[in-house]
């Protein structure tokens, strides 16, 4: 069992609180799903599109204003609880239009998808 605080724990691992990247003995280790508590200052962005995505993703807006760019569509999350889901093979990028907190759930949890900071 593990009891924590998403904001405090996320700050220790680039926002991630559950997934394959946690130690095997940690209850937060999972190869099936990964969860991120993303805290983004206004203007924070993933300018480089994530390509060849092998996971399904769900993003839920907790607070702020957050835009997700998908092929042929721009999705604005602006009310608490707004969410977007996309499947495997869908490229994407994003920008925090205001300071935002976003809960991301992706499955499966696949190694090798980290994008370098600032990209």
Description of each model-found segment:
Residues 1-42, 46-49, 118-119:
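A short, N-terminal "cap"/entry segment at the start of jelly-roll beta-barrel domains
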Residues 27-29, 46-53, 70, 76-77, ...:
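Short histidine-centered beta-strand/loop micro-motifs
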Residues 65, 91, 99-101:
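Structural motif
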Residues 72-89:
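Short acidic-glycine-tyrosine-enriched beta hairpin
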Residues 1-3, 12-15, 95-119:
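Double-stranded beta-helix
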Residues 40, 51-68:
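Short, conserved beta-strand element in jelly-roll/cupin
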């Amino acid at each position: 069992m593990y009891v924590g605080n998403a904001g405090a724990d996320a700050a220790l691992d680039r926002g991630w609180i559950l997934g394959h990247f946690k130690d095997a003995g940690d209850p937060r280790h999972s190869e099936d799903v990964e969860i991120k508590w993303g805290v983004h200052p206004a203007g924070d962005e993933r300018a480089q599109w994530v390509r060849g995505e092998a996971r399904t993703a769900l993003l839920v807006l907790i607070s702020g204003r957050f835009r997700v760019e998908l092929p042929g569509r721009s999705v604005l999350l602006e009310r608490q609880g707004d969410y977007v889901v996309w499947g495997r093979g869908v490229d994407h990028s994003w920008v925090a239009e205001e300071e935002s907190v976003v809960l991301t759930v992706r499955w499966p949890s696949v190694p090798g998808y980290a994008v370098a900071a600032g990209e």
